[in-house]
């Protein structure tokens, strides 16, 4: 916890509680609800899976020498995710048809609905322009491909469950056709590389691990959905902290991948980690070995380097020197004062830890507000509020985000 510089008064984050509640609505939006699903798919999980796939496609494109702006990719991903949250009641076939005839009206409605929530971070005019006239550039092609690949991953489960149900074959053919149209983006990545397909499937399986699994809760967010919440919070709060472009990107990706090792060891609950002496360090060592055997062996050296940077010591403040060696700073103030420029590829682990706690706090508080309660949820929310209600980072009053949800 860091006190503000005495000369500067504390600033309130521009992140709105209304916006955070909207993001969590994504965990209640059922997907494929007109199909016989063997399990429940929700929008928040699909969007997180889409973001992970988009990262792999973007990294592969950059490795093949293509010019690509990751910050723009993340911003456009956020635009598409928010559009889906606002227009949740429109079924995809109708939505795509309306986009052909009423794209400007739909875009204006989305922007108007989000005006009070995101105008401090994004230009509403840029949002409207993007949603009504998506530019035909590599970033949007990657997002489209990631969207269809994540949808295919879900629908393959439905298809194998009941391939003869009405309309199922037509949906499968349409998704396969869309992926075929963008297969040039999968060159050297998916194609015949079964190992990478397994990795993407492994990412998707994080949706099966539920958070707070020992207590009833609504909505029942997954580890996968939680990672996207942390990523978006970290990305947006980077603007409040005036983080450089690469640090902002790293906060999104660091949030997105911070729980990836948990699919290999399962989500061992924090009280057990903290109560058994030496257990947490032992788990970390096991996670490293499992990541090497089951993740890093499937990906390029560049992706390996990124994932290690985002999953090992994920909540420590760090940057990379000229030789790409990871250096840890003594605190966030040192990181921002000396290494807040793109060349250092900095990560404020403290910020991501606060976002991780904020996501957990909201999971508990939102369930309690729905009337779904348990001692674990009540105690968990109280403990997080006590821990974080006065948290400050540089001159930013992050505790306000917790106090506003009391």
Where are these predicted regions, by residue range?
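Alpha-helical, largely C-terminal catalytic domains
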Residues: 1-406
